Amino acid sequence: MSASAFVAVASCLAALVHGYANPGSCSGACNVHDPALIRRQSDGKYFRFSTGNKISYASSSSIQGPWTVLGSVLPSGSSINLDGKDDLWAPDVSLVNGVYHVYYSVSTFGSQSSAIGLATSSTMDLNSWTDHGSTGIQSSSSKPYNAIDANLFNDGGTYYMNFGSFWHDIYQAPMNSAATAAASSSYNIAYNPSGTHAVEGAFMYKYGSYYYLFFSAGICCGYDTSRPASGEEYKIKVCRSTSATGNFVDASGVACTNGGGTVVLESHGTVYGPGGQGVFTDPSLGPILYYHYVDTTIGYADGQKLFGWNKIDFSSGWPVV
């Protein structure tokens, strides 16, 4: 057996042992960090937003691609007057009252001087986006949270913004009826009291009678210069509740506000550090977990991260990929 064939077989066996399917296929522009996915109502075209290039975005006829880069959502940066306004992170996309909303983060790495902003478009065409600045969800060193990693959730017409990264981890803020601004104060819905509180990137998805709170846990970035200890790299976890606003627990019954979280996807085979996830209902494939990851046969740099996706099986009551 050739060396390359041996590596391929070993990678497949590793994936089977851990029980994770390998990422679905991707063609075209597949380098991505913190992806966010939506289909346009008018024609079914897929749009994928990501960190970098003042919120880069691409389109495709399917989740597999071929993905074509369109450009930047906000080529002039954000109107929010904070450091990082020209380096926007972690987009989240939703359709609200017939208008496409892209929420984005303004911050710098390791800082709590952060804000969640909003850009809107009725078409998602290039150069059609209007920046509305801050949603009012902001943080400073006086806050228990970091106002980045936005995720809007629509619970039957009532909107909630999930957000947060490290510090006291994941918070939720009720939004106004237009989902343009926070309507009242935020509260904690997930927290790991141990270590550096390495929880971020929340994404909420309802399936059946449960609300599932997905999040990324561990160290996200810089793997090419400083590899984390084994198991401390990014992975995707989940808790669930019968309410959108709290009481989330993992499969063992541990509260998500006390370190709970059941692993959905972690490093396996040549897949390393999956995270920055979302969940998307594909008309052909059903529920899809999408994320970024490192292919260890290509490289560990942040700019080499790839778009991954797997079908989700909810038959056990918990997401399995």
Swiss-Prot record:
The keyword ATP-binding does not apply. It holds the Pfam family Glyco_hydro_43. GO terms for molecular function: arabinan endo-1,5-alpha-L-arabinosidase activity. Keywords: Carbohydrate metabolism, Glycosidase, Hydrolase, Polysaccharide degradation, Secreted, Signal, Xylan degradation. The active site is at 34 (proton acceptor), 200 (proton donor). Pathway: Glycan metabolism; L-arabinan degradation. GO terms for biological process: arabinan catabolic process; xylan catabolic process. Its main location: secreted. GO terms for cellular component: extracellular region. InterPro entries: GH43_arabinanases, Glyco_hydro_43, Glyco_hydro_43_endo_a_Ara-ase, Glyco_hydro_beta-prop_sf. The keyword Acetylation does not apply. It catalyses: Endohydrolysis of (1->5)-alpha-arabinofuranosidic linkages in (1->5)-arabinans. Its EC number is 3.2.1.99. Belongs to the glycosyl hydrolase 43 family. Endo-1,5-alpha-L-arabinanase involved in degradation of pectin. Its preferred substrate is linear 1,5-alpha-L-arabinan. This is Probable arabinan endo-1,5-alpha-L-arabinosidase A. It comes from Neosartorya fischeri (strain ATCC 1020 / DSM 3700 / CBS 544.65 / FGSC A1164 / JCM 1740 / NRRL 181 / WB 181) (Aspergillus fischerianus). The lineage of its organism: Eukaryota, Fungi, Dikarya, Ascomycota, Pezizomycotina.
